[in-house]
Amino acid sequence: MAVEKVNSSSSLAEVIDRILDKGIVIDAWVRVSLVGIELLSIEARIVIASVETYLKYAEAVGLTAQAAVPSV
């Protein structure tokens, strides 16, 4: 995948369109502990993409119900 370099500035609409077209995944992991005792642990995976992009890549890695059912 080649990186495109554009000299002009991008508008917000172009940036949002590109994010929805390509998709973005944010993994977050937070742990709060006091004196070695874990008080709070948060794990999150946030996916931002269009439905079409999500289904395209989710099926490839087996995250959809259709991909989870073995073919007969």
Swiss-Prot record:
It comes from the Bacteria. It holds the Pfam family Gas_vesicle. GO terms for cellular component: gas vesicle shell; vesicle membrane. GO terms for molecular function: structural molecule activity. Keywords: Gas vesicle. It is found in: Gas vesicle shell. The gas vesicle shell is 2 nm thick and consists of a single layer of this protein. It forms helical ribs nearly perpendicular to the long axis of the vesicle. HAMAP family: Gas_vesicle_A (MF_00576). Belongs to the gas vesicle GvpA family. Gas vesicles are hollow, gas filled proteinaceous nanostructures found in some microorganisms. During planktonic growth they allow positioning of the organism at a favorable depth for light or nutrient acquisition. GvpA forms the protein shell. This is Gas vesicle protein A.
